[in-house]
């Protein structure tokens, strides 16, 4: 089965999750949610890629899901290092390092595993426009880390909403899972 994401209106983690959930039964969604709760993601803030990877390695989930999560956070760490002009091991995670963000990323990885598509395609990505408040203060949309990830070959569409419609984490998820972009 080919899974096709429509990101023309939103490319947030919520949009990704909703589109994945539409392919699953309520029982499958409940099983994913239970797996997230049982996985053991701590609620504290993870400051760097080493802390995130240690948490991922300890999760009670299939190895494929851990591999997906490590790849997504590696994409994020490389983007942060590029934006801040520092070495990978000196990147500092702000919003993407909190426990809720890691749980949300885990949930999407588990949803992808439950859908089990042979191939994933997507439309160009809606980023939105305007400003967003984050740990670094008020920033343009897309945020620098988001823009860095999108610049690696993820096509975007004309911004059409004054909001952050693609975050660094959702851009990294898209970068990892989507194999082809088409309208």
Language-model features: where?
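Conserved phosphate/anionic-ligand binding catalytic regions in large, soluble enzymes, centered on
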Residues: 4-18, 93-116
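Short coil/turn connectors at secondary-structure junctions
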Residues: 1, 88-89, 115-122, 144-146, ...
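Glycine-rich nucleotide/cofactor/substrate-binding loop typically near the N-terminus or early
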Residues: 9-86, 143-146, 151-156, 160-171, ...
């Amino acid at each position: 089965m080919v899974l096709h994401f429509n990101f023309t209106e939103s490319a947030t983690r919520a949009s990704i999750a909703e589109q994945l959930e539409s392919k699953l039964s309520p029982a499958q969604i409940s099983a994913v949610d239970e797996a997230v709760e049982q996985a053991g993601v701590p609620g504290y803030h993870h400051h760097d890629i080493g802390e995130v990877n240690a948490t991922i390695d300890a999760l009670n989930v299939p190895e494929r899901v851990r591999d997906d999560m490590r790849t997504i956070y590696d994409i994020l760490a490389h983007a942060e290092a590029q934006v801040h002009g520092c070495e990978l091991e000196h990147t500092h995670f702000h919003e993407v390092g909190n426990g809720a963000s890691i749980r949300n990323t885990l949930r999407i990885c588990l949803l992808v595993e439950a859908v089990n598509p042979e191939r994933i395609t997507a439309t160009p990505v809606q980023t939105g426009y305007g400003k967003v408040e984050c740990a670094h203060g008020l920033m343009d949309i897309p945020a620098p880390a988001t823009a860095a990830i999108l610049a690696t070959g993820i096509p975007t569409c004309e911004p059409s909403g004054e909001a952050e419609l693609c975050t660094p984490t959702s851009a990294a998820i898209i970068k990892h899972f989507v194999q082809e972009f088409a309208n």
